[in-house]
């Protein structure tokens, strides 16, 4: 069961405790290179201006963003964004947890319902 784009974006916007590091690849990439995205609000006790980050993309050394939306819409994966390439995204881990685990999807959805209430 694949998490929807909307649910993953929601998780990055509202339940940041579980997205410090997320691994994925694109199934239309013959090399299947892994990419990383995440959220780190502080470094050495200092609040960071751009807590959202991407590693292993078109920009050497990765890049940082103020919002999750900016991260998901950044055209840094062969000139396209995660949003544009979503149908080819294969999530491996979300916050260190197996992205395919049924319990993980239930947790995401239950957290979303709780936060929305």
Model-derived features with residue positions:
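Negatively charged, low-complexity tracts enriched in Asp/Glu with abundant Ser/Thr
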Residues: 1-27
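Generic cytosolic/nucleocytoplasmic N-terminal low-complexity/intrinsically disordered segments
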Residues: 1, 43, 49, 110-112
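Short linear sequence elements within intrinsically disordered, low-complexity coil regions
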Residues: 10, 29-31, 41-44, 57, ...
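Amphipathic, interaction-prone secondary-structure segments
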Residues: 17-58
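A short, sequence-level motif marking secondary-structure junctions
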Residues: 9-16, 37-46, 69-77
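Residue-level signal for well-ordered alpha-helical segments
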Residues: 1-3, 32, 63
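Mixed-charge, Lys/Arg-enriched low-complexity segments
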Residues: 61-117
């Amino acid at each position: 069961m694949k998490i929807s784009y909307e649910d993953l974006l929601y998780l990055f916007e509202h339940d940041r405790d579980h997205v410090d590091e997320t691994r994925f690849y694109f199934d239309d990439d013959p090399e299947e290179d892994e990419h990383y995205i995440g959220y780190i609000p502080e470094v050495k006790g200092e609040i960071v201006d751009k807590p959202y980050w991407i590693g292993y993309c078109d920009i050497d050394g990765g890049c940082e963003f103020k919002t999750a939306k900016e991260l998901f819409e950044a055209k840094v994966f062969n000139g396209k964004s995660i949003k544009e390439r979503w149908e080819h995204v294969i999530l491996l881990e979300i916050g260190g947890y197996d992205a395919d685990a049924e319990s993980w999807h239930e947790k995401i959805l239950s957290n979303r319902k709780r936060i929305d209430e």
